[in-house]
Amino acid sequence: MAAKVENGSNIRKIDVKTPDGKVDGTIELPAELFDAPANIALMHQVVTAQRAAARQGTHSTKTRGDVSGGGRKPYRQKGTGRARQGSMRAPQFTGGGIVHGPKLRDYSQRTPKKMIAAALRGALSDRARNGRIHAVTELVVGKTPSTKSAKEFLGTLTDRKQVLVVIGRSDETGAKSVRNLPGVHLLSPDQLNTYDVLRADDLVFSVEALNSYIAAQQAAGTSTPEKVSA
């Protein structure tokens, strides 16, 4: 279900679900974070930079100067009828050096923080406008992890395949319950990024994580935090 927008207000509200299927109040999604313009070109640039930074860059080949041996001329300069050669480690020989091969390099790109933040706001806003952001009190009841219970609960929230679950770092019970579920990716609020948001069909926030994320943006001067209301 799409987020509800109050009349004459730019504040979106979504229901807070409990594992037993009940609704425990609502939570507000500030427009500054969840109703921002989605700049596709910007999101593409940020995701490209993020994926590039994840590349290891440890590939390396040897040029003719790096390959061992080849110091002696393989045969005399004249009189053989063959093309003159100075080293058996030249690129045209088996065992020779590699021409224009990959070398060690850093693929990371410098992306301004404001661009990264704007891209994330655009991605979150797109999901919010399409009713793909959900809030929950917790993933499982109690302190005992249960993958079965977490899977069933997520199934009541969405039937789409890729789900991004955002919970607090201290929620070990929730983390252990969903970490082995296929199609479910787990992050803490401070790890939210454009790539993972766009890759997911739906986002499931715990109330704690959502409030934490909004508060962090407030501290950065982006938005005003909103708390859960009954």
UniProtKB/Swiss-Prot annotation:
GO terms classed as biological process: translation
One protein family per Pfam: Ribosomal_L4
Keywords, in A-Z order: Ribonucleoprotein, Ribosomal protein, RNA-binding, rRNA-binding
Keyword Ribosomal protein included in the entry's annotation: yes
InterPro entries named in the record: Ribosomal_uL4 (IPR002136), Ribosomal_uL4-like (IPR013005), Ribosomal_uL4_dom_sf (IPR023574)
Keyword match NAD: no
SUPFAM superfamilies per UniProt: Ribosomal protein L4
Example of a GO cellular component annotation carried by this entry: ribosome
Cystine pairings recorded for this chain: none
Disordered as annotated region, ranges: 51-105
GO molecular function annotations of the record: rRNA binding; structural constituent of ribosome
Domain of life: Bacteria
Assigned protein family: Belongs to the universal ribosomal protein uL4 family.
Function: One of the primary rRNA binding proteins, this protein initially binds near the 5'-end of the 23S rRNA. It is important during the early stages of 50S assembly. It makes multiple contacts with different domains of the 23S rRNA in the assembled 50S subunit and ribosome. Forms part of the polypeptide exit tunnel.
Subunit record text: Part of the 50S ribosomal subunit.
PANTHER family, per database record: 50S RIBOSOMAL PROTEIN L4, LARGE RIBOSOMAL SUBUNIT PROTEIN UL4M
Protein name: Large ribosomal subunit protein uL4
Gene source species: Mycobacterium leprae (strain TN)
Gene responsible for this protein: rplD
